[in-house]
């Protein structure tokens, strides 16, 4: 199995795999709202492809087996803001679901994110699964999102302290707000 940084050439296949895995309503999900208008962060955004038929017998040569993406977002408290990184989606194609590929993609991507000093990483997911990677809902209980989410699924991996009460916003929304503030004075 070949795991490498995603490139623009992978985008259409990643989108097709995400549509298959999460269905047509995936763009209405809260995490998708946070990604709106952003570009995935190069480096920890990875793809996994079959490069050895013995390792992935039910997949074709060079078939996309999985992907993990990272996106710039922000935490806002009044006029202050803090950069965060949104992890997700993580997707694994059906033929590769029993290979531990999701765990492998997450571990490798987090190692790259740490080497790049991306700072606090947020995701919306299952604490029992993502807890093994250092994610917890402890600090996020009073954070608000631009869409629905169950509080216990809002997970953070961070070393430093962040505000207890804050809004999670898309990077594009924060940029619009900051440009309005600078114009208004």
Report residues per predicted region:
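Glycine-rich phosphate/pyrophosphate-binding loop shared by adenosine-nucleotide-utilizing enzymes
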Residues: 1, 59-67, 85
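A short beta-loop-alpha structural element at the N-terminal edge
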Residues: 2-14
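Active-site rim helix/loop that mediates acceptor-substrate recognition in acyltransferases
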Residues: 11, 19-61, 74
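Conserved glycine-rich acetyl-CoA-binding loop
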Residues: 54, 93-104, 116, 132-133
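A conserved beta-turn-beta hairpin within the catalytic core of GNAT-like acetyltransferases
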Residues: 73-87, 97
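Conserved acetyl-CoA-binding loop-helix of GNAT-fold acetyltransferases
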Residues: 87, 92, 98-111, 123
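Conserved active-site alpha-helix within GNAT-family acetyltransferase domains
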Residues: 115-119, 124-150
């Amino acid at each position: 199995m070949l795991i490498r940084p995603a490139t623009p050439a992978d985008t259409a296949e990643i989108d097709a795999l995400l549509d298959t895995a999460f269905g047509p309503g995936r763009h209405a999900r809260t995490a998708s709202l946070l990604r709106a208008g952003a570009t995935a962060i190069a480096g920890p955004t990875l793809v996994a492809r079959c490069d050895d038929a013995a390792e992935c017998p039910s997949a074709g040569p060079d078939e996309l087996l999985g992907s993990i993406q990272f996106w710039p977002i922000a935490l806002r408290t009044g006029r202050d803001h803090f950069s965060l990184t949104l992890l997700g989606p993580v997707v694994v194609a059906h033929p590769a679901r029993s290979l531990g590929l999701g765990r492998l993609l997450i571990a490798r991507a987090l190692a790259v994110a740490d080497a790049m000093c991306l700072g606090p990483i947020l995701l919306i997911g299952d604490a029992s699964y993502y807890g093994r990677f250092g994610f917890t809902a402890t600090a996020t209980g009073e954070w608000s999102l631009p869409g629905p989410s169950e509080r216990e699924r809002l997970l953070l991996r961070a070393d430093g302290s962040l505000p207890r009460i804050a809004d999670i916003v898309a990077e594009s929304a924060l940029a619009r707000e900051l440009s309005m503030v600078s114009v208004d004075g």
